[in-house]
Amino acid sequence: WSSDVCSSDLESVTNESNYINAEPEKQHAFTEALNNAKEIVNEQQATLDANSINQKAQAILTTKNALDGEEQLRRAKENADQEINTLNQLTDAQRNSEKGLVNSSQTRTEVASQLAKAKELNKVMEQLNNLINGKNQMINSSKFINEDANQQQAYSNAIASAEVLKNKSQNPELDKVTIEQAINNINSAINNLNGEAKLTKAKEDAVASINNLSGLTNEQKTKENQAVNDSQTRDQVANVLRDSKALDQSMQTLRDLVNNQNVIHSTSNYFNEDSTQKNTYDNAIDNGSTYITGQHNSELNKSTIDQTISQINTAKNDLHGAEKLQRDKGTANQEIGQLGYLNDPQKSAEESLVNGSNTRSEVEEHLNEAKSLNNAMKQLRDKVAEKTNVKQSSDYINDSTEHQRGYDQALQEAENIINEIGNPTLNKSEIEQKLQQLTDAQNALQGSHLLEEAKNNAITEINKLTALNDAQRQ
């Protein structure tokens, strides 16, 4: 029996890696051989059979030499390293750290445990990588784009923190719980991204606002609402709504200008303007009306409406009828002032009629009336101017007192008109009547005829005086 068989060295074999990491059946074989030997050593009646003792000793040596724990541990580490190399969700730093932990393991159990942890880490890293790799898709999604800045920043911060965690080259993160917390932070931030719902709400609010815009036509509202519903972002919705409100203001201005047409038509600036300017204004109004009535395709271009508004305002500002009325009044009054046959009261009265005119046609009418009155007054004045010759004529001197008084009265009435100082006669017919009366009275004077008749009667009577000689008769 060798003293080596039961030495403490054999007892310590079970604490060595070669035993600890050996296959279980080999561990069992060694332990059984060692225990069998101990039974002989501990016998009260010692076994004296040398052959039996040598067999048990040889069994211990054989089973000890058969222990392959070191080799098994080496293979386990190699296999673990190979598996870790296939864990493609881990970073290089994580793989190297995991392999370091495996290689520093003292037992196959530790190796298996570290490998299991590496695999679990790989799983959570896959989730984390997927979330990180989905960043671009997320930030380009409606869910993110249409969210408020705080929620967007929370997501971006969660991703950035995860990227820092992932990209550690020194002391890489191997704690599964820490990785899971980063995953939870990202998922929580994603769940708080409600951009799509907010886009839907923004569209609903915008459509309601557009429908309440009183300046737009129904067709314009329909198109603006379609533009809202076609929008991909809240910013686009806001832009459409802003443009709709701006268009509404322009359309309201256009409506006011078109609706004010009758008011403009009732102003002196319009009805005293020339046809060209009035037609330009009316055409501009008609063009503006087509955008309101929808005869044009629904116009959404604010600049087009603004241009139409500008055309109307320009045409309106080019209406200077009131100024032209005043100009015509001034010209008419100058002409009236030069009508030399009217008396001063007549001129003043005619000027008052001109100044009281509301239209240029009235001014022209009063001027023509003044000219006609002036012609009538000329004829009256010319007839009155004959009075000296008339009164010195035989027709007047030798006519009857009745005819003389008739002429004198007609003459006086004519002179009364010429010499008026108040309440002027503006009725041309009345003047023509006085002229006719004076003419008739003048034509009625037949004094020369009466004188001739008287002479003839006297001669006849003288010729009857037989007592007179011829010389006396002559």
Regions found by a protein language model. Name each.
Residues 74-75, 127-132, 255-258, 327, ...:
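Extended, solvent-exposed, polar/acidic, compositionally biased regions
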Residues 251, 377:
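Functional cation/ligand-contacting sites centered on basic and imidazole/sulfhydryl donors
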Residues 1-7:
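Short, small-residue-biased leader/transition segments that mark boundaries at the very start
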